[in-house]
C-alpha cells in the first residue's frame, strides 16, 4: 500500500471523522485480495444509514461518521476491523474534540457509538449476510458479541468508578471491599464447609477435638455423617435409582455445602423462632429449602459467568459443547411432547432451569429430606461428669415428634416438630458467634433499586418489598411504571447509602456485662430461674400451687433463653463488624411503604443495645448548635419525665449532671453508674462518652461527632390524623401547634379521664353502679394507665382491646383483690378512656370511621382495598382467606398454606385505617430522606424517628417540617375517594367527613412537632 493510499485514521485523513482525532495507530488488518466482502460491507453501511437514521434519532453530524465514500473505512482497498465501540472514545485510542460540537450533541453521538446506532447497524448487517454473503455471518456475530460484552463491561466499570467517587474511596480500597463483599455473599457456606473439612483432618492427625468450643464441636460431630448421607442420596440419583422428585435439586450443590447449610439453618431457626427448643417441621423445612434454592441460584449464576469468561478466552470451544447439549435436550423434549408425556417434560425443564423460583412444594420436600437426614445422623453425648456409669450416654441430638395444637381455631390438630436435646438447646445460646449469616451489613454501598428484585445485595436474593406471599401486591409492584416508583427507589437508596460503624467503647462495656452474666442495663440474665422443688405433701392445694410455680418458672426460662439467643446474635454481628471503617444497611419496605434495614440482627431499628453500639461512620464537627443538641439528646435518652421538659429545661438537666456524665464515660462499670438509670442506658452511655470528649477539648465545637441525634414525632399517628382532618384541638394535643413546652397527649387524656371519673364518683351508686368503680380508680389514673390505649387508638383499637390493655396495667399494681374486680374496673376504665379520646380527637375518629366504611363496602364485594401513596407506591392489603395444600415429604405430610381469592372482610376493614396512616408516615420519611440527601445532610430513620449529626439537626428540623406541610398540601382524602370511585364505579361511597380550619403552616414554627 503506497503512502498515497494511506487508509483512514492516519494523520492526513482525520478530517473525515471530525469528532475524533487519533492518539494511537489503530489496528488494520492486511488486505485480502480474494475476499469478496467489500461490496457487502458497503451495502451494509448505506442501508444502516438510510434505514436507521430517522428511527434512531441520530444527528446529522453523527450520520456523517458512517458516510460511504472513496476514503471510507469500507474502501475496496482494505479490510478494516472495527475498533470496539462499546466503551468511551478516549479509552480506545480516540479522544473527543469538545470544540467541534456542543456537549449535548456530542453526548448523543457518543451514545450512538456505544450502543444504539451499533445495534441498528448490525441488525441490518445480519439481514444482509443472510441475503448476499453467508460466509461473513461468523464475523458479524463476533462483532455483535464483542460489542455487547464490551458495553456491559464498560457500564459496570463506569458504575463502580462513580461509586468510588461518590463515597470518597480510592480505587484499590473500593475494589478490595468489593471483593470481600462478594465473598461474604457467595462463599460463606463454602468457607464453613472447608473449615469443617480442615478441622476433621486436624482432629484425625492431632486429636484437636477437645480444644474446640462446645458448639463448634457439635457442628463438627454432625457434619461428616450428614455429608455422607447427602452424598449417598446424590449417588443414588446419578445411578438412576432414586425416583424422588427432590433428588435432582439436591444434586446441584456439593454434599459438604448442603450439610453446612442444613445444620446452620436449623440451629438458626431454633435460635430465632424456636419455642422451648423445638420448631414446626413445616417452618424449618421451608427455611432450609429456601436457603438451598438461594445457594443454587448464586452458584448457577457464578458458574455461567465463569464459563462465559472461559469461553471468551478459549475461543468458544466449551460453548459449542454446551450448544450440542442444548440441541440434544431440545430434541428429547420434542419427542416427549409428541408422545404427550407432559409430566416428564415438566420434570426435565424443572431440573434444567434453576433461575426460576422454586414452588413451595419443592422447598418443603428438599428441606424435609435434609432435616430427616440430620435427625438420623446427628447425636450428642453427655459430658463425662454427668454420666451415671462408664458407658457413654449417646443419644439423638434432634427428635421428630408431634404436638397437639391449642386454641379455638386449631384445637386438637396435630403438627410435627423437631425438638432438640436440652444439651443442644443450652449450646444454642453460645452459637451466635459461629453462625453463618450471609445477610450482613454491606462493606460497599448497596446496589441502587431499579425493580422488584433488582437492588441492594450484589448476589443475595433481594426484594424491594416484603410481600409474604401476597400475589396481588407483588403483581401491582411489578406492573407499576419505573418512573412512578423512582421517588421510592431514590428514598431507599438514600437510606442505604448512610455509613455506619461500631462504637467500640460501648461494645466493650456490653461485652463485659454479658461475660459477667448480664442482668444489667436491661440485658437478660444469663442464668435460669431455679425450678421449685416438689413439696413433700399430698395436699392438693399445695401441689396445685407448686405446679403453677413450676409452669411460671419454665415460662420465664423459655423467655430468657430466646432473649439470650437474640442477644448473642446481635453481639456476634457487632464483633464481626467492629474493625470495619464503615458499613451500610440496604433497605427495603413492607407493603405499606415503611422502610426497614434488611440485615436482621444488629440494626438501628433494634433495641437500645443495638442503637448504643452503632454510630455514624462519618464524623462531623459539632458546632455550637450541635453541642446544644447533643446535650438535649442526652436528656431525651435519660427520660423519666425529663424528656417532657422544654428544650431549655432539658439542656439545664444535662448541665446539672456533668460530673455524673464524666464519671459514666470514664468508669462506666466501676464508678457511680449514673448512665444505668437512663431509660435507654447504652445510648445514654454513648452520648456521655461523646459529650465528655467534646467538653474536655479546648475547642468543643470542632470535635467530630458520630452520634445520631434523634428527632421523634409526638404520637405520630395522631399527628397525621390531625393534619388530614385539619383538626385544631387535636393538633394542639400532638404539637402541630407551637407551645412553651411539649404537649403530652397521654397526660392530656389521663386528665380528661380523671375529670369524667370524678363526676361519676359523686353520683349515687344505687342509680349509677359504676360510681363505686370510679371511686376506686381515682387514685389509679395516670398517663401510664392510658398510654397504650391512646397509642393504639390510631390502629383502631376496639373496646375489648382497650379493656385488656388497662386490665394488664391494673394487675401490675396489685391494688385490686380478685380477678372479677379487676375485670369490672378495666371495663369501666376502657369506656371512659375511649370516650376521652373521641372527645379530644373528633376529626381523627370521624376519618377512621370513614376509612372503615369505605373498606367494608369494597371488601363486601370480595375485592381488596388498594391505594397509591403520595410517592406513587401501589399498596394492596394482603388479607385473604388461607387455603391449605397437603404435600407428602419423606419426613411427614406437610400442610402448606396459600392465599385464596376470598378476602377477609373484617380484617380488610379494621386494618385499613392504620395501614393508610402508616403509608403516609412512610411517605413523609422518604420525602425527608431525599430532601436531606440533596441538602448534604446525613439521614437515618426509624418510622417516626429521624436521625442526623448534631451539627445538622437544625437543617433536619426545617426539612422535615417543610415536607410534612408539602405532603398534606395535597388533596389526599379527595384523591383516595376518587381512586375508589374509579376502581369501583358501581359502588356508592360515603361523602368525606367534615374537616376543620387548621392552617398547616403553623407546623413550620412548632418546636415540639418533632423533638
Swiss-Prot record:
Coiled coil: none annotated. Residues 307-326 are annotated as: Disordered. Keywords: Chloroplast, DNA-directed RNA polymerase, Mitochondrion, Nucleotidyltransferase, Plastid, Transcription, Transferase, Transit peptide. It comes from Arabidopsis thaliana. It holds the Pfam family RNA_pol. GO terms for biological process: DNA-templated transcription. Its EC number is 2.7.7.6. The active site is at 712, 787, 944. Belongs to the phage and mitochondrial RNA polymerase family. This is DNA-directed RNA polymerase 2, chloroplastic/mitochondrial. DNA-dependent RNA polymerase catalyzes the transcription of DNA into RNA using the four ribonucleoside triphosphates as substrates. It comes from the Eukaryota. One of its GO terms (molecular function) is DNA binding. PANTHER family: DNA-DIRECTED RNA POLYMERASE, MITOCHONDRIAL. It catalyses: RNA(n) + a ribonucleoside 5'-triphosphate = RNA(n+1) + diphosphate. GO terms for cellular component: chloroplast; DNA-directed RNA polymerase complex; mitochondrion. It is found in: Plastid, Chloroplast; Mitochondrion. Interacts with NIP1 and NIP2. The gene is RPOT2. The lineage of its organism: Eukaryota, Viridiplantae, Streptophyta, Embryophyta, Tracheophyta. InterPro entries: DNA-dir_RNA_pol_helix_hairp_sf, DNA-dir_Rpol_C_phage-type, DNA-dir_Rpol_phage-type, DNA/RNA_pol_sf, RNA_POL_N_sf, RPOL_N. PROSITE patterns: RNA_POL_PHAGE_1 (PS00900), RNA_POL_PHAGE_2 (PS00489).
